[in-house]
Design a protein with these regions (language model features):
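Short, polar/acidic, helix-capping and beta-turn segments at strand->helix junctions
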Residues: 1-254
């Protein structure tokens, strides 16, 4: 397992990425990750209050907050996404998680996508995850991966980094999906896991990827727990395909 930074107040390690989110999180020994989905997604301000109340009720501090899944009305421009993220991290800073600076620290994993139908009128929180003391000494490891789209690592602007930009042909989609799957595998390995540890695999796209599910996903073991396909777009204009994976210890609906 690669040596990853550890967010000690939250009892989880994380893949350092960009200021708005990490590449994924995994519970440290002696802890595990629980996931809660809201029965009805909540506007962010209400969601933050609900998260605080839930963590307080189970005896956990806000620093146990490890991941969230958001839904936005429509894909952002690069500047719009940056502005949204600047506001988003303010709550994480208040919770004692995010640290500003020349090299900002944000250990929290995140997925943010835009439903094609039943769009929210403002950004909402769909689900969140946090660490708790493990219920069993031999508890299996638990982790949450951030959402990842078909953009190579780089600067703030996405357009120049998108794989097969504006190409939604069968072969264009094949390359996009293959790129994202490779990135999911890389993150899993960094966290100390593999496809065999994944409990839930989720895809987000409005493009037809049916011809790729067997060949690219199931054949490599990415769908052992099935595939959850959300008819939604990634959060930035130009992106067509996003995925995330997780292996939570337990999941609840609130």
């Amino acid at each position: 397992m690669a040596e990853l930074p550890v967010f000690e107040p939250g009892s989880y390690r994380y893949i350092k990425a960009v200021f708005q989110y990490s590449g994924g999180v995994a519970a440290q020994p002696g802890y595990e990750i629980e996931r809660v989905r809201f029965a009805k997604p909540l506007p962010l301000r209400e969601a933050y209050a609900a998260v605080e109340a839930h963590l307080k009720a189970i005896g956990r501090r806000t620093t146990a907050f490890a991941a969230c899944e958001l839904r936005s009305p429509d894909p952002f421009t690069d500047q719009g996404f940056y502005d949204f993220n600047q506001t988003y991290v303010q709550t994480l800073e208040r919770w004692g998680i995010y640290k500003h600076g020349d090299d900002p620290v944000n250990p929290v994993a995140r997925t943010n996508v835009c439903p094609m139908y039943d769009k929210p009128v403002e950004p909402v929180m769909y689900a969140f995850s946090y660490t708790v003391p493990a219920q069993r000494i031999a508890s299996r490891g638990s982790f949450i991966g951030s959402g990842g789209g078909e953009a190579r690592a780089g600067g703030r602007e996405y357009r120049g980094r998108i794989v097969r930009l504006e190409d939604t042909s069968p072969e264009g989609l094949r390359e996009k999906v293959a790129f994202v799957l490779a990135e999911m595998e890389r993150r899993l390995a960094l966290l100390g896991f593999s496809w065999s540890d994944v409990v839930t695999t989720q895809a987000y796209t409005v493009q037809n990827i049916g011809h790729l599910v067997g060949e690219l996903m199931a054949a490599r073991g990415a769908c052992q727990g099935g595939l959850v396909w959300y008819y939604a777009r990634p959060p930035v204009i130009g992106l067509e395909y996003e995925m995330d994976v997780r292996g939570a210890a337990r999941e609840f609906v609130l």
